[in-house]
Amino acid sequence: MSEPKFKHLLEPLKIGNYVLKNRMCVSNSLPHFLQGPETYPADTVMAHYENKAKSAAIVTCMGINNFSHGKQLPMNLDFGHFPDYDLYDTNSQNYLLQLADSIHFYDSIACMGIFVGPPSAYPLMVPKGQQGKADPFAQTKSLNAPPPAEFDLMKIPAHEDPTYYTEEQFNLIADSYAEQAGILKMLDFDMISIHMCYRANLPAKMFSPITNHRTDKFGGSLENRMRFPLMVLERVRQKVGKNMLIEIQWSADDLEGGYTLEESAAFLNEAKKYIDIVQLRANEVDHAHPIGFELEETPFLKFGEYMKKNVPGLVIGVIGGFHYPATCDKAIAEGKADIIYAARAYISNNDYGQLVLEGRDDDIVPCLRCNKCHGRGANDPFVSVCSVNPCIGLEQKVARMQVPTKGGKRVAIIGGGPVAMRCAMYLQDRGHTPVIYEKGPQLGGAIIHADYAEFKWPLRDFKNFLIHQMDKRGIAVHLNTEATPEMIKAENYDVVIAATGANPMVLPIPGADPEKLFFAQETFAHPEKLGENVVVIGGGEVGVEIGIYLSRKGHKASVLEMRDRLAADSTAIHYYSMLEEAWEAEPNFTGITGARVAAIKDGAVEYIDKDGNTQSVPADSVVMSAGMRPNKDLALSFYGCAKEFYMIGDCKKAATIQQGMRSAYATAMRI
């Protein structure tokens, strides 16, 4: 009998009195829309974690924010990101017990994250410059107070001065950690995960010289700076005893001026007296969720390798970009990690773990690293979505959303973009026979440009996955074939699905000649056709990416945007700041906001600035990136070619990949 394809990743691991069924672990994550106002895990939340437990060895649940002395994160500031479970209410405890039990059903370790309130609530509630001026706990008495005027959702201050905490308060906080851990053990949780990274809460702040400027026994030397975090861990271990696993989420190193990798290892060698696992993370919260501009697939594996060598006897877990099982398996085989944590792998694939168990890694859908799973924007409802998995968070109802089918229908799909290909896969899974008609020489549609920009490698992986699936599944594809209603009608299909996409919009600007303008696809494919000075009209996410790409190709790119900031449509949380870093790193990139383009002239583009003045910027070439117009008329021309007719993707409404994937899935489930 052959061994598992990923034998190292699937090998059991003994930790204390527990045995992990494999090395696949789910880090703390949750589709935020699943949890309502309940102070206990909703049924939808339980269904979500149950699904992960079917294959993962450790399932970490989001997360307890309570403080046992009556303080916790105010409801109006938790953004829906963290569930507001009441650990001290007996009715809520009943549901928490059910959550642990549902994870145990699949022989998985039930783990709960702990985020003790005041150290996080304190900087949220105190205006900048006022931290530490009074009793920190007193600042949180008005739990429903609005945030201060200086408060910026995307720049939550993580730098309050811990100087003014007293030793008595340190003891209260440490006791609160221990008390919560004790209750979770009583509720049958096997493990707790204590957040101690990014200088985001008091234990992490106390260890970092960047935030700890104390001169007493809690500051200064390495021994003093580790005193409080070790106090927390010692209290927790004393409370729960030996028969509960304790993990810390830990930034392996720090920003410039902070602690070193060597100091980090020294702390972990002390902490291993109390903890079983360390989950190694980045030194900054946004970079802990790497995107396409991070060209290294798993940028933090090096920390695992270092700690494996320098902290013997502690189980080393790594996280950050671990998606492909071959990469995970190799990391363990080479002794760089003991266990692998992931969140986005399970978000982008409801059946991720099962695919790994079956060795079907080529059926794993790549993650786009767009981080829309954290929310769409700062001013939107904090709704998690996944760009490639339309079933995210639907575990409890996806079966009843599907229309019963016996299959057997012949379906013509007009268009060969990502939405068309994904719809064809879903249709085949339901027993139908899809046929794709693509007028161009290759599949890919609007995402073909991912082949050219190196930072679009996650999107390129997704495109190549879809094309590979067409070939692997034997789905009929007619390239270089411009379908007509007459052609489709003659084939006598049962269903016709129009996926005709959208075309770039040309704004009614004086001098805007479509024959002389460039658009995204051609710009990415042939940057050599553009002159030295390029003006990009439209500074949304696509326009900014065009500007970055051209800058890296040696052009001088000026991006004009009407709104008050560039890439305002991009993911605000754990994405925007890294995109901003990317364009700020390009000396040939210039972003101009509050700019209304007035005219395109020979060698220049004129615009009205935010003060109403006319300005001019040199332009040898002009790229129009002002949105897309759906090909509705073309799509509608296929109505009447079969008994059933549907429109999916951009031809209905120019939208995101996520919206297109949901459109493809929903339509296929109705046929």
Question: Where are the predicted features?
Answer:
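Rossmann-like dinucleotide-binding cores of NAD(P)H-dependent redox enzymes
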Residues: 433-472, 524-525, 549-596
